[in-house]
């Protein structure tokens, strides 16, 4: 069985410039389950969310760059209205 986890770090200036050209996604506070059918990298613009997954949980905030691998099942809790770039 593959060990899937969410990776979170601060992006470089070059990454911010590149990612800021991508599409955005936003949500009001809510909870939902989500299965990643592709690898996704995202940069939080504003807001806050906790992502729970088998083996752990992470909370992402403005300025966080995070990666969710294909096949990961998450329970997302949007704590504050959130907006992110994603690709």
What do these predicted ranges mean?
Residues 15-17, 33, 41, 57-58:
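Short secondary-structure boundary/capping segments
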Residues 9-11, 18-37, 69-70:
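Conserved short histidine dyad/triad with adjacent acidic residue
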Residues 55-70:
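Short acidic-glycine-tyrosine-enriched beta hairpin
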Residues 28, 52-56, 79:
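Short strand-coil-strand connectors
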Residues 35-50:
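Short, conserved beta-strand element in jelly-roll/cupin
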Residues 70-87:
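Ligand-binding loop in jelly-roll beta-barrel domains
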Residues 1-11, 15, 23, 62:
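Cytosolic regulatory regions built on CNB/CRP/Popeye-like sensor folds
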Residues 41, 65, 75:
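Short, surface-exposed charged micro-motifs
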